[in-house]
């Protein structure tokens, strides 16, 4: 069905715990209950994978009426139909690193060693001489990479028999939803998704070396040459929920195969760096603020000559994340690369915002979607180390978002992994087969799959863990302190340098677990 005169598609999102069926049935019936339009409203998308969301065709007046209903949390234009927000999968690439591999030099993901030791084994040095001796490989776990796609024939994703572990699936058929998946959905012409997958589950660069890998290309994350091959957020999230819900019990474990979803992307709003800035910071107004004054109040940008990017929260996306986790899905998400504090409504910085030339206010300390307090939000540590009176401490990467909403940190700078020929950054021949490519990238996009891969190892050991239990176990086992050089006496950043926050693989070198199974590569990878 299409929209009628003066109608457009809106997603009605309900509060948790209300009678969803009664509310939505009232909309499609000719009734007038508590401000619900007195006509039969047409469904635009039934959202069969969501209990709390349905898309309807409404007028602007009807939307405003429904927003007053006590059952309604929010009403939004679906993200795929908005032009004021975009998805970002920015990665950063530099030419020199201290604790990082070099292309074409038989190097590897240094995160494998760093996150397998509680204490920093590098001690201020670039090399350790240590090996990554792994005991678990993610067998029995499914990892979903929501990104730009995955190059499924890359050797990094082979199993011990040389077959690709990237599953060739049609998400519409897998979930039973009525949308059409593009014939070229299962490819990557950007390279970001392939790199992320290699870190989470590659056989040389990754953690979960025998996990099954699923690619779900998100609309808006495709390469410019690949536009239109992704799946819109609403169908993508519903597909994962319905697929996980319908999984059978694995006879080898007595549980469903665990599902880990990595999300190395986020929503942002852009605005020009010039113009008349009005800053609100901690309840104080700074009209006609300069760029330097804006930065001093915690608003960071890539460059004053470029558009500024502000993390943006989308209610429907965050509700989808909550519903995924309630289904039992593990969600791991990148914090973002804006060096911004992320905080909740209880914090003094929650309402920090900027207004440009009298436009609407952009709040910059609330983080970005996808997010929910029950997911695992990951910041990045740097290749450089902080010298604390002779003790070398891992430090937050200069670009990484931080603050109370960031749950844990992982190596994110100078991470080598598999990529496609199409990657826009510098790349070189894959060191194990020169018909393919590898590259070194930096970003919280690279840190998030480190945690997703380690999560798969925990789930291989204990496949019945709930998302809440897994998160608590990962945080309880977190490693040594992370120094945040962005922290200032004024409290612009609130990350406590004494809090253990670095992800730790307890099934690695420090605490080996007796495990017998098929491994996709040999152990003893040198660093």
Each model region followed by its residue ranges:
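C-terminal subdomain of the subtilisin-like protease fold in secreted/lumenal serine endopeptidases
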Residues: 211, 215, 237-241, 248-265, ...
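Acidic glycine-/aspartate-rich tracts in secreted/extracellular proteins
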Residues: 17-19, 80-81, 148-152, 157, ...
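Autoinhibitory propeptides
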Residues: 31-114, 337, 383-384, 395
């Amino acid at each position: 069905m299409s929209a009628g005169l003066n109608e457009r598609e809106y997603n009605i999102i309900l509060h948790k715990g209300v009678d969803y069926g009664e509310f939505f049935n009232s909309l499609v019936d000719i009734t007038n209950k508590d401000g619900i339009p007195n006509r039969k409203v047409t469904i635009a998308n039934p959202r069969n994978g969501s209990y709390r969301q349905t898309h309807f065709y409404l007028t602007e007046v009807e939307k405003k009426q429904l927003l007053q209903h006590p059952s309604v949390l929010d009403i939004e234009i679906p993200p795929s139909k908005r032009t004021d927000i975009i998805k970002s999968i920015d990665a950063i690439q530099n030419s020199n690193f201290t604790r990082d591999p070099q292309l074409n030099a038989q190097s590897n993901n240094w995160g494998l060693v760093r996150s397998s030791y509680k204490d920093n084994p590098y001690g201020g040095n670039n090399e350790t001489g240590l090996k990554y001796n792994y005991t678990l490989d993610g067998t029995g776990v499914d990892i979903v990479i929501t990104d730009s796609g995955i190059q499924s024939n890359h050797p990094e994703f082979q199993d011990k028999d040389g077959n690709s572990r990237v599953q060739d699936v049609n998400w519409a058929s897998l979930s039973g939803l009525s949308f059409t998946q593009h014939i070229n959905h299962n490819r990557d012409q950007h390279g970001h998704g392939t790199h992320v997958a290699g870190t989470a589950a590659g056989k040389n660069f990754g953690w979960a070396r025998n996990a099954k890998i699923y690619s779900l290309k998100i609309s808006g994350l495709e390469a410019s040459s690949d536009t239109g091959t992704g799946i819109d957020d609403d169908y993508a999230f519903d597909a994962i929920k319905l697929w996980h819900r319908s999984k059978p019990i694995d006879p080898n474990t007595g549980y469903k195969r665990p599902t880990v979803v990595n999300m190395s992307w986020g929503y942002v709003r852009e605005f020009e760096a010039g113009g008349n800035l009005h800053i609100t910071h901690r309840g104080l107004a700074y009209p006609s603020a300069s760029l330097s004054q804006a930065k001093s109040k915690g608003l960071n940008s890539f460059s004053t000559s470029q558009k500024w990017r502000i993390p943006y929260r989308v209610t429907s996306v965050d509700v989808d994340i909550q519903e995924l986790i309630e289904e039992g899905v593990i969600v791991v998400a990148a914090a973002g690369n804006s060096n911004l504090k992320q905080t909740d409504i209880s914090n003094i910085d929650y309402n920090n915002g900027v207004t440009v030339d009298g436009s609407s206010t952009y709040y910059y300390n609330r983080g970005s979607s996808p997010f929910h307090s029950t997911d695992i939000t990951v910041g990045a540590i740097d290749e450089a180390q902080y010298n604390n009176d002779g003790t070398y401490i891992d430090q937050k990467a200069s670009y990484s978002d931080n603050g109370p909403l960031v749950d844990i940190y992982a190596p994110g700078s100078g991470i080598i992994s598999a990529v496609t020929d199409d990657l826009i950054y510098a790349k070189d021949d894959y060191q194990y087969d020169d018909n393919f490519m590898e590259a070194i990238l930096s970003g919280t996009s690279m840190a998030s799959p480190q945690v997703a891969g380690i999560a798969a190892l925990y789930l291989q050991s204990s496949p019945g863990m709930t998302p809440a239990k897994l998160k608590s176990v990962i945080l309880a086992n977190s490693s040594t302190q992370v120094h945040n050089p962005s922290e200032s006496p004024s409290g612009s950043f609130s990350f406590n340098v004494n809090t253990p926050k670095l992800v730790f693989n307890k099934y690695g070198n420090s605490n080996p677990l007796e495990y017998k199974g098929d491994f996709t590569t040999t152990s003893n990878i040198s660093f």
